[in-house]
């Protein structure tokens, strides 16, 4: 059974030897050479330092295209025209599935046709030197954003290539993405990723790690999301990671979102070791977007307002073309500017929201209950407890494609749009918390004159793309 135990240097080296060879040579990811490259980078390209010294909310988009020059130009555009403080490199789907041969074919077609035949940057195929070229040619810190359950080779290549932040984790890049891996396997894979990050950190190169807070991106209750990213932060800390950015996906109700990010920061400070610097990220709305770009800007603006009120360390922005596919560089930059405009205007105001403290207390109590259940299931071992808690359903997520989660929890919005649980499954929440959730949902049912049912959930899933927050009867 998996244990929350730090890999030894010998184990780290053995895994690196095992995963390299076919697509990347062992020599290409030479650790001493990689550390020297990181040390050559100027301070403004050091991701953790920029995060941890930020005096205002930082903005970061999502972006990635297959050809290296085009990818660099895209990032430069987002920096210069969008004002991005931090830059992404979003990895293509084939690489996420470890299908490097297919990624190579897509990259070759992209070069032949002068077009994008992949939906991201195939970092493994570009290799360490290709990654270093990206880092050299842009003028801001760059993060690897992907969705890879087995990210070991991707981490080895991109970290040797000069990237200093790596998104994801064994839960957040398993349960929402795939049915191919059990949780114990991905925890083992990510122990390598985190230990590699820890090894760099011990040599003076701080690598930031960021659990993916939005999970399935669909009505995820804040307490569940926060418990899971906290677990991933704890697993990373065991392996020597010292910079952790806890992530949360906006649900759309201002009070609940502000309360959730504050709760996440408080829980992170409470549970993670003092040796770890904890920062936070708010992901703008991850659900369906309106097709009308003006309305899409409205969704982005609300997220910007949320970020202004709660002041996470950074906000991951969206574009007004989310509903139609991969956004253009111009659209992506527009989403950054919309967010920045709202942040700047609200920075000059003092706004207090009623009910935040009460909601934050409810969220924190729920998170502690979930984490207690994990520790109890693992007899104090967070890795073992995570596997057992998901097996038992005491920790769960809604709408998982993975068999590693029961998927027995069902969320719905209450009468002012906060995400509650309609079905609890076996999730480890106390009776009083369940009563609060049910009472809030009953109030909505009374308002709408209908029974609590899955129809309400389905209406909520499509509400934002239809121009509302709550899926009321007759809105279509």
Curated annotation (Swiss-Prot):
Primary enzyme class: isomerase
Cofactors, names only: adenosylcob(III)alamin
Keywords: Cobalamin, Cobalt, Isomerase
Domain of life according to the entry: Archaea
Single biological process term from Gene Ontology: anaerobic glutamate catabolic process
Pfam families, per the entry: Met_asp_mut_E
MF term (GO), any: methylaspartate mutase activity
Database matches in InterPro entries: Cbl-dep_enz_cat, Glu_mut_E, Glu_mut_E_C_dom_sf
CDD domains: Glm_e (cd00245)
Reaction catalyzed: (2S,3S)-3-methyl-L-aspartate = L-glutamate
Annotated EC: 5.4.99.1
Pathway in which the depicted protein is active: Amino-acid degradation; L-glutamate degradation via mesaconate pathway; acetate and pyruvate from L-glutamate: step 1/4
Protein residues bound to L-glutamate: 62, 96, 145-146, 167, 173, 177
Residues given in the record as adenosylcob(III)alamin binding sites: 64, 119, 176, 289, 318, 322
UniProt similarity note: Belongs to the methylaspartate mutase GlmE subunit family.
Subunit structure: Heterotetramer composed of 2 epsilon subunits (GlmE) and 2 sigma subunits (GlmS). GlmE exists as a homodimer and GlmS as a monomer.
Functional description taken from the UniProt entry: Catalyzes the carbon skeleton rearrangement of L-glutamate to L-threo-3-methylaspartate ((2S,3S)-3-methylaspartate).
Protein name: Glutamate mutase epsilon subunit
Organism of this sequence: Halobacterium salinarum (strain ATCC 700922 / JCM 11081 / NRC-1) (Halobacterium halobium)
GN (gene name): glmE
């Amino acid at each position: 059974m998996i244990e929350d135990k730090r890999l030894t240097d010998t184990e780290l080296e053995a895994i690196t030897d095992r995963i390299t060879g076919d697509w990347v040579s062992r020599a290409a990811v030479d650790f001493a050479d990689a550390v020297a490259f990181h040390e050559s980078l100027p301070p403004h390209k050091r991701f953790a330092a920029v995060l941890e010294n930020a005096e205002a909310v930082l903005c970061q988009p999502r972006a990635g295209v297959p050809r290296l020059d085009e990818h660099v130009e895209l990032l430069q555009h987002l920096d210069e025209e969008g004002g991005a403080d931090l830059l992404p490199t979003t990895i293509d789907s084939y690489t996420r599935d470890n299908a490097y041969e297919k990624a190579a074919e897509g990259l070759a077609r992209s070069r032949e046709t002068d077009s994008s035949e992949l939906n991201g940057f195939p970092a493994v195929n570009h290799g360490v030197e290709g990654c270093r070229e990206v880092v050299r040619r842009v003028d801001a810190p760059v993060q690897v954003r992907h969705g890879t359950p087995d990210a070991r080779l991707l981490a080895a290549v991109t970290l040797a290539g000069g990237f200093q932040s790596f998104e994801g984790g064994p839960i957040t890049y398993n349960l929402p993405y795939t049915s191919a891996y059990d949780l114990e396997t991905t925890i083992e894979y990510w122990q390598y990723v985190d230990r590699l990050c820890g090894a760099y950190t011990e040599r003076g190169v701080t690598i930031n790690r960021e659990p993916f807070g939005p999970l399935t991106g669909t009505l995820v209750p804040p307490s569940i999301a926060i418990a899971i990213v906290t677990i991933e932060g704890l697993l990373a800390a065991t392996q020597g990671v010292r910079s952790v950015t806890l992530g949360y996906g906006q649900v759309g109700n201002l009070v609940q979102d502000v309360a959730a990010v504050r709760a996440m920061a408080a829980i992170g400070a409470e549970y993670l070791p003092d040796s770890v610097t904890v920062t936070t990220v708010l992901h703008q709305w991850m659900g369906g977007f309106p097709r009308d770009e003006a309305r899409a800007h409205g969704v982005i603006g609300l997220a910007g307002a949320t970020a202004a009120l709660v002041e996470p360390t950074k906000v991951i922005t969206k574009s007004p073309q989310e509903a139609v596919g991969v956004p253009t560089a111009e659209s992506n930059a527009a989403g950054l500017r919309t967010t920045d405009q709202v942040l700047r205007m609200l920075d000059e105001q003092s706004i207090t929201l009623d009910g935040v403290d009460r909601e934050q207390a409810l969220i924190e109590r729920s998170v502690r209950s979930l984490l207690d259940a994990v520790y109890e299931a693992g007899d104090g071992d967070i890795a073992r407890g995570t596997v057992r808690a998901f097996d038992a359903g005491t920790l769960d997520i809604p709408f998982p494609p993975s068999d590693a989660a029961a998927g027995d929890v069902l969320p719905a919005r209450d009468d002012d749009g906060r995400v509650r649980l309609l079905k609890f499954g076996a999730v480890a929440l106390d009776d009083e918390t369940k009563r609060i959730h049910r009472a809030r949902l009953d109030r909505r049912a009374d308002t709408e004159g209908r029974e609590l049912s899955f129809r309400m959930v389905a209406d909520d899933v499509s509400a934002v793309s239809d121009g509302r927050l709550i899926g009321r009867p007759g809105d279509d």
